[in-house]
Amino acid sequence: MINRVKTKQIFVGNVAVGGDSPISVQSMTFSKTSDVFSTVEQIKRLHFAGCDIVRVAVPEMEDALALRAIKEQISLPLVADIHFNYRLALIAAEVVDCIRINPGNIGSRERVKEVVKACQERNIPIRIGVNAGSLEKEFLNKYGQTSEGMVASAEYNIKFLEDLGFDDIKISLKASDVQRTVDAYRMLRPKNNYPFHLGVTEAGTLFHATVKSSIGLGALLLDGIGDTMRVSITGELEEEINVARAILKDSGAAKDGLNIISCPTCGRIEADLVSAVGEIERRTTHIKAPLNVSVMGCVVNAIGEAAHADIAIAYGKGKGLVMVKGEVVANLDEHELVDRFVQEVEKMAKEF
């Protein structure tokens, strides 16, 4: 059981972040934000995939001016990602549910003061998003692109916002490699109680991003660290959500959806187990009940796994068993097994 660190709770739109709230999953569109149609379409795809909070890039004035039209067409909380030009943050703050600023490139303290004032007036939070690749010069010169440098930047900017009377804050500390990222979050966690946004930046394409994020975010989640998260995958909207949800579930940080146990296959199996598992995954994505299910290709491990599973299939030659709580409920031909299995899953899910 994960002993999650209790943090201050803030709200991004209607989504609670921190405190006792579930760890939320975020993503980011890759369309030009000024292209309202494409951006809204991507946000709706993310919403359907299970995203909780969505972020959009705001590099130009035309992007900032498009935010209102986007916000009117979506129901997910909207975060504006601001670099370099604080004036874009002032415009965005009139519309969005959260502002993300990068203290390494947003400009002078006077500019940050104006952003804070705009967020205070609308009662929206600020994410202090520290990146190893864009640290302020003073921290870069002293620490280099290190975990220590990221933590020093975060602490400095947290204090600056606090001195302005602003504490509606969440924090991220991202590097492109796992070790620096994990070390930074671990170093900063004991020093404040603000919610943490987890992520490994520039993680890469699907395979590499999944590996990096699973190691980095999984390690932090097992430490009880993290209140919201994004898995960054180059050009893969829905997969960001799928991987993030899987990391949350398999780390034990979230208790929703099926935990599917399936054998790795070997010479003993006499059924198309790969296709069966794939079909089960597709047909049960809507299930939120925290059920443990087992799909095994032969009797060697099937009975033992079934004893610990809510629902199980044990394949044999042309036939197989469906079991519920370790008891056989059906002995069927192979082509009937998945249908009956899904029926049992849906039946049990309704009881939760």
UniProtKB/Swiss-Prot annotation:
Annotated InterPro entries: Dihydropteroate_synth-like_sf (IPR011005), IspG_bac (IPR016425), IspG_bac-typ (IPR004588), NO2/SO3_Rdtase_4Fe4S_sf (IPR045854)
Annotated EC: 1.17.7.3
Catalytic reaction(s) noted: (2E)-4-hydroxy-3-methylbut-2-enyl diphosphate + oxidized [flavodoxin] + H2O + 2 H(+) = 2-C-methyl-D-erythritol 2,4-cyclic diphosphate + reduced [flavodoxin]
Main enzyme class: oxidoreductase
Highest taxon, organism lineage: Bacteria
Pathway(s) annotated for this protein in UniProt: Isoprenoid biosynthesis; isopentenyl diphosphate biosynthesis via DXP pathway; isopentenyl diphosphate from 1-deoxy-D-xylulose 5-phosphate: step 5/6
A biological process term (GO) from this entry: terpenoid biosynthetic process
Swiss-Prot/TrEMBL keywords: 4Fe-4S, Iron, Iron-sulfur, Isoprene biosynthesis, Metal-binding, Oxidoreductase
Positions annotated to bind [4Fe-4S] cluster: C263, C266, C298, E305
Cofactor binding note of this UniProt entry: Binds 1 [4Fe-4S] cluster.
Chain's role: Converts 2C-methyl-D-erythritol 2,4-cyclodiphosphate (ME-2,4cPP) into 1-hydroxy-2-methyl-2-(E)-butenyl 4-diphosphate.
Entry's family note: Belongs to the IspG family.
The name this protein goes by in its record: 4-hydroxy-3-methylbut-2-en-1-yl diphosphate synthase (flavodoxin)
